[in-house]
Regions:
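Ser/Thr-rich, low-complexity intrinsically disordered terminal regions
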Residues: 1-102
Length: 102
């Protein structure tokens, strides 16, 4: 959070089902492999494979509620290596860019 202040929780004034569907579509559009998607548990788990070295990175998207709004939190972590040279942050920026499109 501190290193990437633009990657904060997003709040949407929409129905939970609509936000969840849009998140799932965004993940699929980005080419992520959906590992688990469970509307009832408000969670999507996915894997993205890097182009050059074929490293697998894990993404978890969770959904909550706040004052009749849907709160979306997304995290991306690399399975190998110490640093990712911003790949995880860029992955989440691409995801939220799709989520925030009208």
């Amino acid at each position: 959070k501190g290193a990437y202040p633009d990657l904060i929780l997003r709040v949407y004034d929409e129905r939970h089902a609509d936000v969840y569907r849009r998140a799932l579509n965004a993940a699929e559009t980005l080419g992520w492999e959906i590992v688990a998607a469970d509307f009832d548990s408000r969670r999507i788990e996915a894997t993205d494979t890097t182009l050059w070295f074929r490293f697998k990175d894990d993404i978890v998207i969770t959904f909550g509620t706040q004052s009749n709004n849907v709160v979306v939190n997304a995290r991306s972590t690399s399975r190998v290596g110490v640093g990712d040279v911003g790949a995880n942050a860029n992955r989440l920026r691409a995801f939220f860019a799709l989520m925030d499109m009208p």
